[in-house]
Amino acid sequence: YIKSDEKKYSWAVKFFKPKFFSNRIEVGKNNFEITFKAPKTDVGTIFFNSFLEYKDKEFKISENNFIVLTDAKIVNEKKIVGNCARFKFCSPLVIREHNREDNTDRHITVEDEDFFDKFKENLKIHFPSFSNSIDNMKMDISEMKKAVVLFYGLYIDVSLGIIIINADNSLLNEMLISSVGSKNASGFGLLQLIESWEMI
């Protein structure tokens, strides 16, 4: 990828019984899972083959820790049925608004009054062909909350939890396989489908 290219993939890490501290994460088991999504088959195939090449090899991640890839498998994404879906954010949602005049960033969360507008603006950037559907979509964010994460030495505001979205079926499926928000390739915005249904 060229630095300015938008990277068409996303990922999330699942730890078992994690405890988060200011300078470390303690886990209940010595294994974890990584979910990797790529909406384009060719991109997914390239990464999957790369993963297999490094299977069973040690990767040192700190002075006293290393990780080993023990298994990799392809899982077909479930299709959303209907126009309403309940999603879980497996990795935090980042909505970034950049001010070119002073070169600063604002990160919008579910606690901000303009969350819905900024989220829709972000979706239109990533899914321009669904612009009208995005205008008409409805969201329930009552099960979401604001959080703060450390990203390359900076603390940024994010949103976590479960979101319900009522929108065009094709848009919902596109959001599921492509992920949403900003910084997807850095491990943000990956959605997991909990359930879907048709709302009249």
Model-flagged regions — what are they?
Residues 1-200:
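RNA-interacting cores
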